Amino acid sequence: MRVTNDFLLGVANMGNEETVYVTLDELAAKESVDAGTRQIPYVVFILGESTDRNHMSLYGYHLDTSPYLKSRHAKGELAVFDDTISCGNGTANVMSMVFNTSTKERDENVCWYKYPNMIDILRKAGYYAVWLSNQEPVGRWGNFDRYYAKRSDTCHFLHISGSAAGGGVAAAEYDEKLLPLLDDYLKLNQQPKQYYTIHLEGTHENFRRRYPKSFAKFTAEDEPGESDEQKKMQSEYDNAVYYNDYVVDEIIRRFEDKNAIVFYISDHGMDLYDTGDFAGHSSEEKGSYHMIEVPFIVWASPSYKEQNPDVWARIKGAVHRPYRTDYIMHTIFDAIGVTSSSYEVKYSVISDEYAQLKRIYNGALYEKQRS
């Protein structure tokens, strides 16, 4: 399986660690923040990994890979956005944009840490920020995770062995190991406003390592691949998607009795022989739409909906709008009523002022390539 060398972005554009933190501190000090009047007590951002929404039954896939979220959707609990693409093909590239005001169109000479970030802004808005991760804090892909985690009030990584040291993805625990940690924080954290980043290992290859045996629901016989090897890999990926559905649902379940809103996206997608003899994710120049078509889901608790019916109506009414994940910070802020000097309402997909952007992929409009 071939994967993009997007870790080169992390190495070349990471910056000296001391310089990074000094710059982030300066930006945070300059940022003007208004916490607003909604005062949502619980805000959760789940960042998944390598999940192509075209392999989710929630989005119409032929195998029942997302029964838990489908059940919630059938009950009207979810807003399922069906035209959202990732801002990049690889984790490091996406991480350099999703948590800050940087975008795909940014000046390439301006490093990621020179843009105001969501964690610092939410903390200035009075949120106690918790970072829970099943990804690596050090290594080819882990550096962004570490930097953003350290901007939080507290952070916890399930494993710390970096990919460069032979650990990383291979050393990852099952994502459900994050659930007891989340339970502990919810039990012990007495802060009135809490923000959680939950970074999953998701459906990252090696797929068969992403789920326990009890979630081995699909076999090669269920798959359309041209060879036994392809079918086996596809079935393992679909099992990983199935398990990921369970984990996301379990996270949501923990906020059902609270005034809470949960956002879920995957960092990027995955091509499994969908467009040719290729499995993995590549550079954009060699990429396919499967590598960027990601799930974007919003769940809100009954309490949130009762207190913010107008906002929930806007969220539900925006599910068919074209969007890209490097602007998600603005949507999150809009949903919880936080504004700042870096917030731009036109980038919130749920806003009446949303300005649809041109989504360029591999030098051409994404819509034209997909039609």
Question: Model-predicted segments: where are they?
Answer:
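Histidine-centered active-site microenvironments of extracellular/periplasmic hydrolases
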Residues: 60-64, 260, 265-308, 343-345, ...
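C-terminal cap/loop subdomain of S1 sulfatases and analogous C-terminal strand-loop tails that border
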Residues: 270-275, 337-371
